[in-house]
């Protein structure tokens, strides 16, 4: 084995020279230079400074403007709530531990940080699944004239939390475990060992199949069908130009969210899968640190995409920030094509 395994940690560094210490007790400066830990802390500070205001603003603007409280926006707000969980439950902890060079909060703190990071990522993934299904059902109409209403949105939000908890909670109760990863300043699922005492192998397989592969299959199926249907509807001119434009804009926004999710999380998932399938292989702490910390940037991109691509929300946000007056002078009529409401695009 090219790493050192302890009772509640795995350090990707051989202890032949006897320098390895528990990441809960002493700085891990034998893994990387102190300035590299400082860079991680600076990065986490940046994510907190950007992530909290933009996600809080998303929630606040929606509460302030009744016109934004549409069923589809419930799912988008769910993403903002998940991102805030990551900011407060994960990023603040990782900032502090990076400044100290090791996970100063011990195994209990590691469990909490790993839980919130996993929970936030899984809520985001399952929210994208719900959005994909909503777009598919509304645009492709496999169930005739289905209308995505408030009750459906609430059920979708509840579903995302149930599925996210089904992934994030088991390591807290004995099925797998959370341990420090990479440079040992943040925690995640144990992909490094089989750890039969906590049935780690079965959990990792369960996680990759149920909480990554299946959601990706559903998302790609829905959008594959959706793109075909929208093209057919446009070719046959079955709906007005305004309706088609509205549907294209909403669909484009959600697809971009999926693309950015993959950009942020696919490197982490790929590295984790490689480590799990190559037990004991030689890899450095940076190998897992970079994708793990890059994945944390997902807390920023969803609200940014929403603000940039949804004109109605952007106008409401500017009105809120400018004390009731939109400096651009855009009214609601100009934002009609960007409203995230139910679709009227007919099937092909």
From Swiss-Prot:
Tissue distribution: Rod-shaped photoreceptor cells in the retina (at protein level).
Subunit and partners: Homodimer. May form a complex composed of RHO, GRK1 and RCVRN in a Ca(2+)-dependent manner; RCVRN prevents the interaction between GRK1 and RHO. Interacts with GRK1. Interacts (phosphorylated form) with SAG. Interacts with GNAT1. Interacts with GNAT3. SAG and G-proteins compete for a common binding site. Interacts with PRCD; the interaction promotes PRCD stability. Forms a complex with ASAP1 and ARF4. Forms a complex with ASAP1, RAB11A, Rabin8/RAB3IP, ARF4 and RAB11FIP3; the complex regulates Golgi-to-cilia rhodopsin/RHO transport in photoreceptors.
GO annotation (BP), single: detection of temperature stimulus involved in thermoception
Taxon lineage: Eukaryota, Metazoa, Chordata, Craniata, Vertebrata
InterPro entries given in the database record: GPCR_opsins, GPCR_Rhodpsn, GPCR_Rhodpsn_7TM, Opsin, Retinal_BS, Rhodopsin, Rhodopsin_N
Binding site for Zn(2+): 201, 279
Covalently lipidated residues, kind S-palmitoyl cysteine: 322-323
Keyword Aminoacyl-tRNA synthetase set for record: no
Regions of this protein lying in the Cytoplasmic compartment: 62-73, 134-152, 225-252, 309-348
Motif 'Ionic lock' involved in activated form stabilization, residue numbers: 134-136
Gene Ontology CC terms: cell-cell junction; Golgi apparatus; membrane; photoreceptor disc membrane; photoreceptor inner segment; photoreceptor inner segment membrane; photoreceptor outer segment; photoreceptor outer segment membrane
Family according to the record: Belongs to the G-protein coupled receptor 1 family. Opsin subfamily.
Gene Ontology terms, MF aspect: 11-cis retinal binding; G protein-coupled photoreceptor activity; metal ion binding; spectrin binding
Residue spans, topological domain Extracellular: 1-36, 97-110, 174-202, 275-286
Pfam families: 7tm_1 (PF00001), Rhodopsin_N (PF10413)
Function (record text): Photoreceptor required for image-forming vision at low light intensity. Required for photoreceptor cell viability after birth. Light-induced isomerization of 11-cis to all-trans retinal triggers a conformational change that activates signaling via G-proteins. Subsequent receptor phosphorylation mediates displacement of the bound G-protein alpha subunit by the arrestin SAG and terminates signaling.
Residue positions with a glycan: 2, 15
Residue stretches spanning the membrane: 37-61, 74-96, 111-133, 153-173, 203-224, 253-274, 287-308
Keyword entries, A-Z: Acetylation, Cell projection, Chromophore, Disulfide bond, G-protein coupled receptor, Glycoprotein, Lipoprotein, Membrane, Metal-binding, Palmitate, Phosphoprotein, Photoreceptor protein, Receptor, Retinal protein, Sensory transduction, Transducer, Transmembrane, Transmembrane helix, Vision, Zinc
Residue stretches in coiled coil: none
Chain positions of site Plays an important role in the conformation switch to the active conformation: 113
PTM description: Phosphorylated on some or all of the serine and threonine residues present in the C-terminal region.
Residue numbers of Phosphothreonine PTMs: 336, 340, 342
SUPFAM superfamilies associated with the record: Family A G protein-coupled receptor-like (SSF81321)
Protein name: Rhodopsin
């Amino acid at each position: 084995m090219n790493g050192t395994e302890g009772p509640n940690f795995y350090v990707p560094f051989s202890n032949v020279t006897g320098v390895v210490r528990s990441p809960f007790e002493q700085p891990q400066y034998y893994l990387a230079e102190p300035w590299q830990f400082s860079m991680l802390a600076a990065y986490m500070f940046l994510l907190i400074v950007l992530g909290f205001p933009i996600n809080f603003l998303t929630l606040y603007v929606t509460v302030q403007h009744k016109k934004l409280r549409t069923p589809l926006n419930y799912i988008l707000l769910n993403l903002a709530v998940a991102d805030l969980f990551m900011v407060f439950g994960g990023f603040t902890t990782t900032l502090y531990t990076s400044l100290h060079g090791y996970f100063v909060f011990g195994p209990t703190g590691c469990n909490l940080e790993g839980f919130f990071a996993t929970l936030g990522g899984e809520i985001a993934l399952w929210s994208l699944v719900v959005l994909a299904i909503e777009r598919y059902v509304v645009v492709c109409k496999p169930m005739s004239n289905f209308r995505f209403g408030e009750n459906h949105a609430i059920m979708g939000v509840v579903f995302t939390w149930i599925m996210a908890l089904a992934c994030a909670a088991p390591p807290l109760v004995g099925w797998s475990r959370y341990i420090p990863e990479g440079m040992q300043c943040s925690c995640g699922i144990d992909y490094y060992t089989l750890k039969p005492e906590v049935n780690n192998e079965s959990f990792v397989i369960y996680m990759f199949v149920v909480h990554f592969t299946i959601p990706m299959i559903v998302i790609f199926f829905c959008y594959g069908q959706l793109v075909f249907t929208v093209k057919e509807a446009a070719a046959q001119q079955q709906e007005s130009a305004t309706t088609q434009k509205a549907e294209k804009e909403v669909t484009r926004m959600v697809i971009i969210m999926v693309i950015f999710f993959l950009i942020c999380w696919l490197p982490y998932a790929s590295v984790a899968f490689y480590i799990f399938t190559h037990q004991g292989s030689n890899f450095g702490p940076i190998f897992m640190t970079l994708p793990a910390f890059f994945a944390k940037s997902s807390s920023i991109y969803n609200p940014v995409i929403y603000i940039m691509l949804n004109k109605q929300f952007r106008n409401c946000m500017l009105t809120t920030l400018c004390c009731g007056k939109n400096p651009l002078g855009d009214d609601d009529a100009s934002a009609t094509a960007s409203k995230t409401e139910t679709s009227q695009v007919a099937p092909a």
